[in-house]
Amino acid sequence: YPGSPGSYAVRLIFFDGEEAFVRWSPSDSLYGSRMASTPHPPGARHPVEDDHIPFLRGVPILHLIPSPFPR
């Protein structure tokens, strides 16, 4: 259990890409990493928030990753 003596926690973070228009500045592509690096508020019980909408069968999607659709 994370937080118990001798335990380790691993966090894998995959950020969505962002395209810059006209010019790329040092602040582009950092929105997700800035949010992930901010501390959680005191009393936060669950540091992970799942805000993804699950796949629905039969709904067309924009398929960007060249791999088979999960079944």
Swiss-Prot record:
NADP keyword on record: no
GO molecular function: glutaminyl-peptide cyclotransferase activity; zinc ion binding
Name of the top EC class for this enzyme: transferase
Binding site for Zn(2+): 19
Localization annotation: Secreted
Catalyzed chemical reaction(s): N-terminal L-glutaminyl-[peptide] = N-terminal 5-oxo-L-prolyl-[peptide] + NH4(+)
Transferase listed as a keyword: yes
The enzyme's E.C. designation: 2.3.2.5
UniProt KW keywords: Acyltransferase, Metal-binding, Secreted, Transferase, Zinc
Residue intervals passing through the bilayer: none
Tissue specificity annotation: Expressed by the venom gland.
Location of the active site: 18
Disulfide bonds: none
Domain of life: Eukaryota
Gene Ontology biological-process entries: peptidyl-pyroglutamic acid biosynthetic process, using glutaminyl-peptide cyclotransferase
Cellular compartments per GO CC: extracellular region
Recorded family membership: Belongs to the glutaminyl-peptide cyclotransferase family.
Function comment: Responsible for the biosynthesis of pyroglutamyl peptides. Has a bias against acidic and tryptophan residues adjacent to the N-terminal glutaminyl residue and a lack of importance of chain length after the second residue. Also catalyzes N-terminal pyroglutamate formation.
Entry protein name: Glutaminyl-peptide cyclotransferase
Organism: Crotalus atrox
